[in-house]
């Protein structure tokens, strides 16, 4: 049915395909003129309308799609959109890439809080650091009587910058507090190794980190209930589904069928936290060479910032330090259960 008319429309495929490039989305007036700091380009609908979403409003995103569905390209779209919006002083990333070949392209950009994380243990550590950073930021907001990071930037930081010279070393400026976006490219690999720690870390951040400018983008090619648990789903209302293998997988990610019928190669169903039903669109296409060109440009025109998180390699030593936001350790067997040692002794004696 056609809305507003007593007619029925039949969709016919175009005889010639048109490529939806990321550049056409980033040059859209809606994207260029928007004041939203974390606006990202999603794609174009069947009518040619461009779709954008504000990560600050989402405030977290769950992405699922099988191999070849365009999941990795979609993640690149989101990252490049954010890089076009904000510089390293206003936006920082923590990237987790167990596959080691997708997000490592961004290893040299100054936006990274730490080099791209490839090990499951370090991913858990990064989530623990983010939780401590979240608590610290809440203390900062409380001390300045600000409701959220947007209010803090507008009423505290911008006001101080208008009244003072940033180069004046005698004045102590309020903390800048950049937005932090945590991107995990393959949730299933880490969930296999540390299911309880990963779920707890994600849920804690998803419940509370929105107000302090920390956001999660999680992707997986296996959207089963073992990977996308009920707690994770309940706390991440924004979903982006590419082609999946079965209707069960579609219901896991969207709570509705449909994603199993998508065509692949960026054909997407997006359901935001404020949407009653998913919207179908074609995600923008971006090549590996284009990603490398953007990275080279950013590295050339920006000074490298010191890593805010340094993750050590040893298992038994202090393995992580930060620039004033606390430290965190590798997860160990002793973290799993207080009675683990006693149970182990009982099994040995038996």
Give the positions of each predicted feature.
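P-loop NTPase switch/communication element
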Residues: 56-59, 83-121, 125-126, 231-232
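Residues at the beta-strand->loop junction immediately N-terminal to the Walker
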Residues: 64
């Amino acid at each position: 049915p056609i809305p507003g008319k007593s007619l029925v429309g039949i969709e016919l495929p175009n005889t010639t395909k048109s490529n939806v490039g990321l550049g056409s989305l980033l040059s859209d007036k809606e994207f260029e003129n928007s004041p939203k700091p974390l606006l990202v380009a999603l794609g174009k609908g069947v009518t040619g309308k461009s779709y954008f979403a504000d990560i600050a409003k989402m405030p977290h995103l769950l992405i699922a799609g099988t191999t070849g569905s365009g999941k990795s390209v979609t993640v690149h779209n989101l990252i490049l959109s954010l890089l076009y919006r904000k510089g390293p002083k206003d936006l920082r990333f923590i990237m987790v890439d167990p596959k080691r070949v997708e997000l490592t392209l961004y290893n040299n950009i100054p936006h990274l809080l730490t080099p791209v994380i490839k090990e499951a243990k370090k991913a858990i550590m990064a989530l623990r650091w983010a939780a401590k950073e979240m608590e610290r930021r809440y203390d900062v907001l409380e001390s300045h009587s600000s409701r959220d990071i947007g209010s803090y930037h507008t009423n505290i930081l911008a006001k101080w910058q208008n009244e003072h010279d940033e180069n004046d070393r005698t004045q102590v400026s309020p903390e800048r507090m950049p937005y932090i976006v945590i991107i995990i490219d393959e949730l299933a690999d880490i969930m296999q190794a540390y299911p309880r720690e990963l779920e707890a870390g994600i849920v804690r951040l998803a419940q509370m980190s929105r107000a302090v400018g920390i956001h999660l983008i999680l992707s997986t090619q296996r959207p089963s209930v073992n990977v996308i648990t009920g707690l994770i789903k309940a706390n991440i209302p924004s979903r982006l589904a590419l082609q999946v293998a079965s209707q069960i997988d579609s219901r896991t990610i969207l709570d509705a069928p449909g994603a199993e019928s998508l065509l692949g190669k960026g054909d997407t169903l997006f359901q935001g936290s404020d949407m009653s039903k998913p919207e179908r669109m074609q995600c923008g296409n971006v090549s590996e060479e284009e990603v490398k060109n953007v990275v080279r440009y950013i590295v050339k025109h920006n000074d490298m910032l010191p890593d805010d998180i340094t993750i050590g390699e040893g298992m038994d030593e202090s393995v992580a330090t930060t620039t004033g936001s606390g430290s965190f350790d590798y997860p160990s067997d002793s973290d799993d259960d207080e009675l683990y040692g006693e149970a182990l002794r009982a099994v040995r004696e038996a």
